[in-house]
Amino acid sequence: MSSAGDSGPGYVLNDFDAVPRLSYARSIDIRDSLSDLIRIQRDSYDAFIGIDEGSSGGIQSIFQSMFPIRDPLGRAVLEFVSCNIGEPQYDEYECIKRGITFSVPMRITLRFVVWKVQEVSFKEVKYVVDEGTLERSVKYMKEQEVSIGDLPMMTSYGTFIINGIERVIVSQMHRSPGVFFDSDKGKTYSSGKLIYSARIIPYRGSWLDFEFDIKDIIYFRIDKKRKLPVTYLLKALGMSNNDILDTFYDKVLYVRSDKGWKVPFVVDRFKGVRLSYDLMDVDGNVLIKANTRITLRIAKKLYADGLREYLVPFAGISGLFVATDLVDPASGAVIVSAGEAIAAEHIVKLELFDISEIAFLNIDFLTVGPYVLNTLFLDRHITQEDALFEIYRVLRSGESPNLEAVKSFFKGLFFEPDRYDLSVVGRIKLNSHLRLDIDENLTVLTKDDIVHVIKKLVLLPDGEGVVDDIDHLGNRRVRSVGEFIENQFRVGILRLERMIMDYMSSVNFDNAVPCDFVNPKILATVLKDFFSSSQLSQFMDQTNPLSEVTHKRRLSALGPGGLTRERAGFEVRDVHPTHYGRICPIETPEGQNIGLISSLAIYAKINKYGFIESPYRKVIDGVVTDSVEYLLATQESDYYIADAGAALDENNRFVDDMLYCRHGGNFVMVKREDVNYIDVSPKQIVSVAASLIPFLENNDANRALMGSNMQRQAVPLLKAEAPLVGTGMESVVAAGSGAVVLAKRDGVVHRVDGSYIVIRAFDKNKDEYLGVDIYKLRKFQRSNHNTCINQRPIVKIGDYVRTNDVIADGAAIDRGELALGKNVLVAFMSWQGYNFEDSIVISSDVVKRDVFTSIHIEEFECVVRDTPLGPEKIMRSVPDVNEESLSHLDDVGIVNIGAEVSAGSVLVGKVTPRPPVSLPPETKLLVTIFGEKVFDCVDSSLYLPPDVEGTVIDVHVFVRRGVEENDRSLLIKQSEVNSFRKERDYEIDVVSEYFYDELKKLLCSADLPLNGHADVESLLAAKSLEALWEIGLSNPKISAKVADMKGKFDELITEAHSKFDQKIDKLNYGYDLPQGVLTIVKVFVAVKHNLQPGDKMAGRHGNKGVISRIVPVEDMPHLEDGTPVDIILNSLGVPSRMNIGQILETHLGWAAVNLGHRVGRMLDSGEEEGPVVESIRSFLSEVYEGQKLKEDVASMSDEALLKFANRLRRGVPMAAPVFEGPKDAQISRLLELADVDPSGQVDLYDGRSGQKFDRKVTVGYIYMLKLHHLVDDKIHARSVGPYGLVTQQPLGGKSHFGGQRFGEMECWALQAYGAAYTLQEMLTVKSDDIVGRVRIYESIIKGDSNFECGIPESFNVMVKELRSLCLDVVLKQDKEFTSSKVE
C-alpha cells in the first residue's frame, strides 16, 4: 500500500488507501510494536497449546506430569505416549451460525502395560521398574489412541466461540507468587508502633505468614489460622535451640585477661553507641570516656589508629546473652544456658570456675534486636515432635493422629510439589528478594527460604531494609487466557487421574485396553464450566471494532484469586508510578470498579512470566539510538529515563545539557550524559482508546476517561466517515481489530463482488504458481450487541496489493481507518434553552441525510419440539390468525426474506398439539352446517415483539439429522451449495487463467507449424485451454514441460474439487440439535434507527448529551453563505468540564474543511489544467510545510496530483497525536491559509428571523458519535401485562413489559393535593386489587362509570406475614363506620 512514507518520483495514492494525514507528530513511532494489538491473547493461548518452540508449558507437559499412572498393587501401569490435536470440524462463521462451540478434537496415545507375576523366559521383554533393581516381565502391552474431549480453540481474532457466542477471556492482575514484607503503618496499636510482617504467597498451596506482636515476639500463621511462635516452625523443621541461635545471631568471643575481657574491635558495631564504660585498649589506656556517643567517623578513626581489640571490664558483661551453654569444668553442671543473659551472680561464678573465654550473641538492641531469642524463650523446652503436633492441632483441630501422619501432613504443607507450588515466577521472586541461588525448577519451599525470610523480617525493626509496595507492578503479574485454561486443564486431568486409579483397583486387567480407563466427559465438563460461567470469561463487547480491541486488552483485578470490589481500598485502585507505559492511567470504568479494571498501555507487552514490560530507546553518551529495549518495572527504577518530548538535534543528540528524567518513581534533573533511556513515544502511557482522542493533553483527566469509555459505546453508522481531526492511530486500531480484511500475501486482485475478493498470489521474483486467496466477506451479520457487521471491498480488479494491506472495510471503518462517528458542523451557542444541561440541538437535515442512521440486527428464534401429544409443526395455516397477518409467510410457514415486519407480525407459523376437547352440541351443529375445521392444536407461532419494526434479511433453518427437511431448509441448503460452488469456480478460474498464460508463453517460444496463420499468437488466439494442452503434448520438443505443467494443473483442480466435496459432505451431515428439538428457525430482522430526541450523543472529549430537539433546517443558525449548522452545543458545557480539546478540535476541523474547500475552488476554477495543477501544488506544499508529504506532493505527476486534490475536497485530514497536538500558532496559520478568521469564530444568522447574532460564534467541524443508549430501546409503555405471583402487582421494567412504579413519594404528592379517589384507584384497582380489576373491566365494557374498590392483595400478603409470626389478624366490619380496621 502506498503511503506518505513511500515517497519518491511519481508517488501515487492508491484508490483503496486513506488520504495521508497532515501530522503534527514530533517523535518517531515504532509501528512494529502496534502491528498486533491482541498479541496478549494469542501469545498466551499459543504457549498453552505448545506452539512456541522451547516452551516449557503446553498440553504435552501437563500430560507428562500426570503419567505414568500405576496400579496401587503394582500389577500394571498406564503410560502417556503422545498427544494429538486435530482440526476443527466447522469454521468460525459456521460455529456462530449453528450455535456450537468452535473447538478441536483432542486425542492422546496411551500405552497400557500389565506385568507378569510368574517366572518368565529369557525371550520375553524385560522392564526395569522403580523398585530397586527388580525386573518384571510384560504379560501384555496395548497401545491405543483415546479421545479425551474437545478443546475450545481461539479464533484468529483472539476470541472463543462458545455455544455460538463470541466470548473473551479477560486477563487478570493478581499479586505475584513470592515473599512480601509489609507493615501496618502504625494503625494496629494506639501507640503508633510499626508492626512488621512477611507473607510467602505460593501459586498453589498454603499461605505462610510471619508477624511481630506489640512485645516484639515473632509469630507465624498458616492459611490465616491461629498464630504460633515462629520457633515452633523452626523446631518442626528440625532445628535445635543452639541451631536457631547460631543461625540468627553472630557470635562475639570475649577472652579473659588480667584487666578485663578482650574483645575484637569491629567498626560497624560501634555506630551510634553510647558507652557505659571507658573504652580502653588492651594495655588499659583510656581512649574514650564513658557516656560518650561514638559516631561512625570516630570508630573509623580508632580503627585507622590501629585499634584491633579493646577491654571490657569484668562487670561489663552483665546483661549480655551467652551463645552456648557455660558449663562447670569440674562437675559438668550448666552455669548459664545458651541464650540466657549474664546476671551479677553469674559473674561471681565465672571468676570461681576460672572460665577463660565466653562466646556472646551479638545483640546490641540498636542494630540487632533479641526478637528471635525472646520468641525462643517463650517455650525453649519444646521438642520437634511437640512442635509438629501443635501445628497439626491448629490446622486440624479435633483429630489425634500418630507421629508419622503428623510428619507427612507437615511435609505436604510446603515441601511436596503435589500440594504446594510456588511456580517458576515465585521461585525467581524469592531468589531475588532473599539473594538465594536455588534452581528455578524447585518450586516448593526449602528450609533456607523460611530461615532467610525470618532473617530479613527481623532486620526491619532495626531500620535495615524497606517494606514492599504491593501495588508496584514488580509485585503484580498478569494471568492471561492460556494460564487460566492450563489451570482448568490440570483440574480436569487430576479428576481423570483419580478416576483411573479407582478403576484400576477394581478392574480385571486380562482384557482391559486404555480406552476403558478414560472418560472424555470429565475434562470437557471442566473446560465448559470455565468458559460458560467464569467471572473472567465474558460476553464480548462487540459494539464497534474499538470495543472489541479494548475488551481483549483489558486487565481485571477481580475474579477468582483476585480482589473483591467491596474490599478493595483506595491504594490498589490508584495510579502508581510503575504504571507508566504499562497500564493506562486514564481508561477505567466510572462506577464501583474504578481502578480495578484497567487497560494495557499501547506499546506494553507481557513477558513469559506475566510481568508487564514497556519499551524504551537506548541512550549512549547523550545520543539516542534506534535500539529499543523492553524493561520491567523493577529494572526501570535503576535507570534515568528521559521524556519522549526531549529536544534532539539532527544527530539524535540531546540539545539541552540538563534534562528532567524519571528515576525510582521521582523526577530528577540530570546531565544528558547520565541519561540511560528515552521514551519511545509520548503516547506510550495511554491505552488504545485514549490514544484516539486528539488534544488529549488539553482535557481534564475525568473527561478524558469518559471520552475513552464512550468511544467504545459508539454504534457503527450506515456510512462510515473517518475523522478529519484524528490522531494517526485510526488505521492501527482498524487493522488490529479484525474488523477489516487484510491481504494474507502479495498478489493481484482477480475478481471482486459484494461477497468475495479473489486475489492471485504474486511475487515478482518467482515464476511458479503461488496459489489463490479467496476472502469471503461478512455480510449483514449480527454482533453480540445487535449492531450490524458488514464488510465492503475497497479494491478493484487489477489492483496490486501487498501483505497486510486493507482490502475490505468493516463496520465503522473508512478506507482502513477507524470511523466511529461523523464530522458535523457545530456551533457553540445557546438556542432557545434547548441545549440546557448538555442537551443537543440537531438539524433536521442531519436526519434527512441519514448522517447518524444506524442498522441494528435483531435475532428471533423459534424452536419446534417433539411433545408427548406429538410433534409441533411449522405451517402457514395457523388457527385463529387471519390471512392478512400470514401474507408475508411462504408456503412452509416461514417469513420471506425482504418482508417488512412490524410489532405483532408472525415470523414463523407454528402449531402445538393439544389434548382433544369435547365440543358442546351447539358447536358440533355449527361445525356440521358450515364445515368449519376443528383444530386439535393451538397457535404457538413466533411473533415480532412490540418494540421492533424492520426488514427480514436472513433466515436459518436447522433440521435435526434424520428428520425430513422442509422446502425452505432445502432452498437454504441449495443456496449454500451454490456459494461453495462459486468459491470452487473462482479458484479454478484463477488456476486456469495462470496456466493458460504460461502455456501460451511456452508454445509461443516453440517452433509450431503456422497452418496459414500469420504468427504463432494468431494461431493460438482462439484456442481453448484443452486445445493448447493437446498442441503442447503433441510437440516433442516441449511435451515433457507441458506434461509437467498439466500434472500440476490437474493436481490443483482435483484439490479444488476435493475441498468443495468436503464442504458439501459437512452440509449434508445435518445438525445435532438438543434432545427433543426437531427444528430451529432463526429469523434476522434489520432495524433502522434514525436519530431522534432522546438519543445519546458524545464527542471524543467526554462531551456527552442527549438530543433535546430536531429543528427544521430552515430554522437553524446559518453561516454568511447560507450553510446551516448541523449541531448546536452549549458553550457553558466547556469551562466547568475543562475539556478544551473539543474547542481545539473544532478550530482544526474548521481549518481542515476550509482548506479542502479552497482546493475544490481551485479545481473548479475553469482555468487550463497546467496553471491549476501548479497552483494546487504550490498551495499543498504550503499546507504540508515541514511534512514528509510536501516531498510527495512535489514528486506527483499532474494526473496523480489532480486525483489527490479531488480526494481533499471534503477536507484535509489532520493528525494531532496524543501529547503532540499542534500549538495555537500552527492552528492559526492553517486558518489563515484557509481564508477564514484566525480566531475560529464567525458571524452566524438566526434561521428564523434572518438577523445576525450580536456576537461572533465559535463554529467548526467536530467528530460526534451516536452511542448505543438509543431512546427506542429505552422508551416503554404498558397496557396489559404480567402480574407478580405473590403481590399481584404489575412487574417492572421493559424486559418484563412492566408498569411505572407509583411509589411512596408519589402517594405523598396525591395526599398533599387531597386527591383521595385518585389515590384509592392507584393503590387498588390500578395495582393489586384482583377482584376490583375484574369489576372495573366489566364496568368499562358495559359503559358504566361506577366501580368499587376492594382490598389490595399486598394487604393480604401483610396479613399472611403477620400470621406467620403467630399473630391472629382478623378483618371485622364495624357497624358504626363504613371503613375496615384491623384488631
From Swiss-Prot:
Catalytic reaction list: RNA(n) + a ribonucleoside 5'-triphosphate = RNA(n+1) + diphosphate
This protein's UniProt keywords: DNA-directed RNA polymerase, Nucleotidyltransferase, Transcription, Transferase
Entry's EC annotation: 2.7.7.6
Entries under CDD domains matching the protein: RNA_pol_B_RPB2
GO biological process terms on file: DNA-templated transcription
Single Gene Ontology MF annotation: DNA binding
Gene Ontology terms: cellular component: DNA-directed RNA polymerase complex
Pfam families registered for this protein in UniProt: RNA_pol_Rpb2_1, RNA_pol_Rpb2_2, RNA_pol_Rpb2_3, RNA_pol_Rpb2_45, RNA_pol_Rpb2_6, RNA_pol_Rpb2_7
Oligomer status and interactors: The RNAP catalytic core consists of 2 alpha, 1 beta, 1 beta' and 1 omega subunit. When a sigma factor is associated with the core the holoenzyme is formed, which can initiate transcription.
Family recorded in the similarity comment: Belongs to the RNA polymerase beta chain family.
Role noted for this protein: DNA-dependent RNA polymerase catalyzes the transcription of DNA into RNA using the four ribonucleoside triphosphates as substrates.
HAMAP family attached to this UniProt entry: RNApol_bact_RpoB
Protein name listed in UniProt: DNA-directed RNA polymerase subunit beta
Species annotation: Anaplasma phagocytophilum (strain HZ)
Protein's gene: rpoB
